[in-house]
């Protein structure tokens, strides 16, 4: 299950980069995440390697956790919801451990893509 989730999340990250790079909007209804997975929010950065927002989320009545060691931003989902698309922010870097994005005490510029929805 973790491998499937990681693969789905990685594909989403690549999709998010492509959407931001092409500055196009794609409706979420176009994607089939299956019955037990949901897309994790991501933020792009200047190296074009998007990272996940946090490491845990509720999905279809259950919990989803990213694999330990996965790069993430220490940003809450409600903060991501309020971010202005295409505006650069200073984002704290983290690494997933047991469903928590642990702060690495480093920051990099990141931004929410144009096609990202709440």
UniProtKB/Swiss-Prot annotation:
Signal peptide: 1-21
Lineage: Eukaryota, Metazoa, Ecdysozoa, Arthropoda, Chelicerata
Function according to Swiss-Prot or TrEMBL: Salivary chemokine-binding protein which binds to host chemokines CCL1, CCL3, CCL5 and CCL22.
Any Gene Ontology CC annotation: extracellular region
Compartments where found: Secreted
UniProt-listed Pfam families: EVA_Class_A
A GO molecular-function annotation: C-C chemokine binding
SS bond list: 38-59, 55-96, 72-101, 91-110
InterPro entries listed in its UniProt record: EVA_Class_A
UniProt keyword annotation of Ligase present: no
Glycan attachment sites: 45
Chief place of localization: secreted
Keywords: Disulfide bond, Glycoprotein, Secreted, Signal
Protein name: Evasin P546
Superkingdom classification of source: Eukaryota
């Amino acid at each position: 299950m973790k491998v499937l989730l990681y693969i789905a999340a990685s594909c989403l990250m690549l999709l998010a980069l492509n959407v931001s790079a092409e500055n196009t909007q794609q409706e979420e209804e176009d994607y089939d995440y299956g019955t037990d997975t949901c897309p994790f929010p991501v933020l792009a950065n200047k190296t074009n390697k998007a990272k996940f927002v946090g490491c845990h989320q509720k999905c279809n009545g259950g919990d989803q956790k990213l694999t330990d060691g996965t790069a993430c931003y220490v940003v809450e989902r409600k903060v991501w919801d309020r971010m202005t698309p295409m505006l650069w922010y200073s984002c704290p870097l983290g690494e997933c451990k047991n469903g928590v994005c642990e702060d690495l005490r480093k920051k990099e510029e990141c931004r929410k893509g144009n096609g990202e929805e709440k």
